[in-house]
């Protein structure tokens, strides 16, 4: 089903950006302002059934014209008011038009399905610059196992993740996304005389992303069923005693943090200059998408891997942040959930994994056989 047919099925009279611009232009002509403003990219707001047409002058957004999608009339209550637009038009200083640059077509990645076995901070160096189109991963938890510590210090853990974030920035295409599943971790108390600690890992990682050249885009919350967090033991003392100050909620959410490789280009640039219009069209998302940043997904269990994330989580991220035939990178591949979702959605993948045991799981799960390149 085409996007236009989708709009028609909703009862929209306005079904394209071209129509929205024409209606907005007629409105400006009535105000004698048609030569004062240009239009940004119109966007449809299917929650309120309106089109929003940005008004731009001297490179800055001045206001917007809001059009009722079902009646094709101007929504005067939501649009920028006429006196305001007239006042802004008087302030506009016209500058010579910039020479239109030659359109750059973004080339297709040369990579095929690939497994890199070894420490990802090192194996990622084998990949060419700007050769992947999306990074999605869930890094190992910091010292989550009570029987031993995997890292000498928390700083050592952050240093490892910084090196991976930095190398991913190099291999990620301009303006594309790095999506990471991460959550605060609970360090159990060593004795009855010590308190447990909860470390806010997502907020420390945010600082690393910003310092390494990414732009923060979104925070999504993966919501699990209510009973999912009781295994941590958090909240049991309060549940028994009910004393103030002891309250600790049971955590049933994890963060999905979305970053974009910093660029001066709008996201629309990545869409308009894509090498395959067919892939862009085939990647369009239907009406059953997640409307909010609360994603309710049941946790997954895999007896062969202690910390897998659900297939549904990988499926959503790949669908929302990549096109068909894109290359999806997971630097901490684990059992290969990201690879399986990538294949099912018509994408390619590059998986980094240090464990031979999990490499075998990925090979088994993707069922690609000889079509899968493995580099040690």
From Swiss-Prot:
Highest taxon in the source lineage: Bacteria
Sorted UniProt keywords: DNA-binding, Methyltransferase, Plasmid, Restriction system, S-adenosyl-L-methionine, Transferase
A GO CC annotation given for this chain: cytoplasm
Disruption phenotype: Loss of methyltransferase activity.
Family annotation (Gene3D superfamilies): Vaccinia Virus protein VP39
Listed transmembrane segments: none
Family: Belongs to the N(4)/N(6)-methyltransferase family. N(4) subfamily.
Name of the featured protein: Type II methyltransferase M.CfrBI
Organism: Citrobacter freundii
Gene name linked to the record: cfrBIM
């Amino acid at each position: 089903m085409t996007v236009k047919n989708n709009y028609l099925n909703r009862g929209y009279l306005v079904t394209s950006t071209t129509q929205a611009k024409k209606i907005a232009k007629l409105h400006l002509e009535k105000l004698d302002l048609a030569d004062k403003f240009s239009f940004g990219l119109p966007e449809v707001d299917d929650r309120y059934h309106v089109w929003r047409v940005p008004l731009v002058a001297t490179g800055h957004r001045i206001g917007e014209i809001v059009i009722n999608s079902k009646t094709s009339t101007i929504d005067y209550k939501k649009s920028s008011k006429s006196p305001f637009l007239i006042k802004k038009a008087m302030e506009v200083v016209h500058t010579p038009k910039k020479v239109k640059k030659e359109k750059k077509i973004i080339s297709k990645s040369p990579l095929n399905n690939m497994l890199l076995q070894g420490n990802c901070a090192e194996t990622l160096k084998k990949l060419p610059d700007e050769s992947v189109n999306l990074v999605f991963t869930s890094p190992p938890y910091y010292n989550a196992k009570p029987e031993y510590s995997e890292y000498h210090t928390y700083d050592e853990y952050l240093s490892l993740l910084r090196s991976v974030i930095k190398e991913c920035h190099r291999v990620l295409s301009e303006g594309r996304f790095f999506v990471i599943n991460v959550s605060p971790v609970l360090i159990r108390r060593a004795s009855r005389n010590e308190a447990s600690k909860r470390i806010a890992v997502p907020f420390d990682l945010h600082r690393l992303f910003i310092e390494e050249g990414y732009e923060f885009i979104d925070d999504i919350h993966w919501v699990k069923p209510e009973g999912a967090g009781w295994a941590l033991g958090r909240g049991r003392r309060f549940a028994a005693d009910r004393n103030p100050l002891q309250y600790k909620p049971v955590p049933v959410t994890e963060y999905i943090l979305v970053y974009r490789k910093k660029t001066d280009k709008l996201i629309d640039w990545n869409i308009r200059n894509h090498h395959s219009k067919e892939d862009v069209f085939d990647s369009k998302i239907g009406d059953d998408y997640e409307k909010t940043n609360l994603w309710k997904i049941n946790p997954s269990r895999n007896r062969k891997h202690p910390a897998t994330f659900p297939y549904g989580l990988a499926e959503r991220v790949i669908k929302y942040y990549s096109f068909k035939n894109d290359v999806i990178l997971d630097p901490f591949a684990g059992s290969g959930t990201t690879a399986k979702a990538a294949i099912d959605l018509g994408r390619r993948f590059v998986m980094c994994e240090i464990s031979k045991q999990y490499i075998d799981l990925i090979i088994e799960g993707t069922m690609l056989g000889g079509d899968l390149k493995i580099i040690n």
